[in-house]
Amino acid sequence: MISSWCFWSEPTWAELKRRYDGQVQFQWKIALMDPSGLPTSREQEQWFYRRSGMMMRSAFMLNTDWYDPSLPEWLAPNCVAEAAKDFGFTDDRVRLALARAALREGKNIADWHIVAETGAEAAGIDVDKLLDRAKSPVIEKRIRASTAEFRALQITQRPAFVIDTEIGDRAIFSGVIKLEPLAATLDSMLDDAAAYAAHKAHFGDPPKK
């Protein structure tokens, strides 16, 4: 959730949701970053931010003040974002608020209270209830399970887009954040699914033998 490339992908994600509203079901999941994918220093983090910012032609540079290289993973913001789902907030508002707090404002998102306050304000819910839920074993279990799903895809780059259709087609993008290839793939897969539906309307299910 706090990956810089996930942050840069948000406009694409928002446009895909707008463009395919009513045609595609969208869902986000957490894939925790471990030491193998985390910078070893704040200076290294700044270097990565400069590179991604230049690639995105960004008018601003991401903030590294939040980053603590001694931490092996970032449970607090991810658990709070996941916990907000249990209060009915399955959209992007809490996740985006936490990402902005870290990557734009440099807030200490390793602090459970800071991230809970940020998430609660974004969702308009009680901060103590959100914090209690975020710290519950069930939430950590859920994000570790979704992280295991990510690893099972045998990809390494975030964000990852996994597109499935009812006819069994699947497309996986790892580290791709531009709209055009994702939209082209969705158009192709939706067209194939529509063709299957049209064929079934004319001929029914396949013969059993």
Regions of interest found by a model, annotated:
Residues I2, E10-R18, R100-K209:
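C-terminal cap of thioredoxin/glutaredoxin-like
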Residues F7-R104, A197-D205:
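Structural alpha/beta surface segment adjacent to cysteine/selenocysteine redox centers
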